[in-house]
Amino acid sequence: MWETKINPNKVFELRCKNTTYFGIGSIKKIKDILEVLKNKGINNVILVTGKGSYKASGAWDVVKPALETLGFKYSLYDKVGPNPTVDMIDEAAKIGRETGAKAVIGIGGGSPIDTAKSVAVLLEYTDKNARELYEQKFIPEKAAPIIAINLTHGTGTEVDRFAVATIPEKNYKPAIAYDCLYPMYAIDDPSLMTKLDKKQTIAVTIDALNHVTEAATTLVASPYSVLMAKETVRLIVRYLPAAVNDPENLVARYYLLYASALAGISFDNGLLHLTHALEHPLSAVKPEIAHGLGLGAILPAVVKAIYPSVAEVLAEVYSPIVPGLKGLPAEAEYVAKKVEEWLFKVGCTQKLSDFGFTKEDIPTLVRLAKTTPSLDGLLSNAPVEATEAVIAKIYEESF
């Protein structure tokens, strides 16, 4: 395949709504990025990250000296957890405001970078808080400059305008999407991802798979989102087993990261629908659930529900997983079964019962899918009408 002709050590610029430096060693581009900020009169930043990955990955070994060499003032918020809450965002924003930060650097996967995006908004809207942002009490039109240093190959948040946070007292996990949330620059360096363990590697990659499953089949899907989806699935099927078997395999990490970026661009254009709308209540109620594994638990049932309406599209997109499909509605159950078999084969084996849910929880999950701010927008993009009965059946078939 053509991938063998590409030098993964050659950093290239992936230009979409932002500029992403992509390739092994691209973390060194942070110095160039900081110089751009400095030329704009910005010399004070807040770094938003998790509790240890920014150090374990090796990113901090490059970022910290670059900040100090260029004379930047910086503050650090390193308490972002999986499925971050609005309270974490407010804590970080408070530090940023108090220290006079004029830009935000997010280091991590989707949780830290989404938190960084949200903090960037609140640095500009000092009279607002994260609950107001995620309950859509105001529509932000500006944010402080955002730099995203990505440490996982799954969310695509470094190339898109989305962010997610949980409002814990309501079990809401809404998403927001505004143009001001695009990072100014992003870094996608696969050498920072070799410390991802097997579970993390699987979870983040299944997130990317779901992004394109949805982006290719929404009511606003386009040839562009379908094209990105086809290549994403091909790369995931080829390189996920290699990364699971050998975490240090930089070629596998490179192409999974590229697949993740493509998936981010795909759903930035084609949007999302059922799997994300139905997973968000799961990880809102049980924050310990890895987002990608929650998606994997319900994906086969979603495929079964939507395939008759989008058979020709999914037959092509899923051909690396289920070869030989004819794109006929009658294939729905077969495709769902084969998708689940593939998920189990790569190590994504958990179903809703494994997360501690029972079928008595289904009415609550349906209610959250229907009432959480923003999820109605996702449901309205589904290729089938997302009635309560349809949603309940998907949950029912995911145990």
Curated annotation (Swiss-Prot):
Enzyme's top EC category: oxidoreductase
Stated EC number for the protein is 1.1.1.2
Keyword list (alphabetical) reads:
NADP, Oxidoreductase, Zinc
Summarize the temperature dependence annotation: Thermostable. Heating at 70 degrees Celsius for 180 minutes gives no observable loss of enzymatic activity.
Q: Does the keyword Chaperone apply?
A: no
Q: Which reaction does it catalyse?
A: a primary alcohol + NADP(+) = an aldehyde + NADPH + H(+)
Which ranges of the sequence are coiled-coil?
none
For molecular function, the Gene Ontology terms on record are: alcohol dehydrogenase (NAD+) activity; alcohol dehydrogenase (NADP+) activity; metal ion binding
- Lineage: superkingdom: Bacteria
* Named cofactor requirement(s): Zn(2+)
Check the record and name the InterPro entries matching this protein. Answer: ADH_Fe/GldA, ADH_Fe_C, AdhA-like, Alcohol_dehydrogenase_Fe
Stated role: Alcohol dehydrogenase active against primary long-chain alcohols. Pentan-1-ol is the optimum substrate in vitro, but also shows efficient dehydrogenase activity on propanol, hexanol, and ethanol.
Assembly with partners or alone: Homotetramer.
Q: Specify the protein name.
A: Long-chain primary alcohol dehydrogenase AdhA
Q: Which gene encodes it?
A: adhA
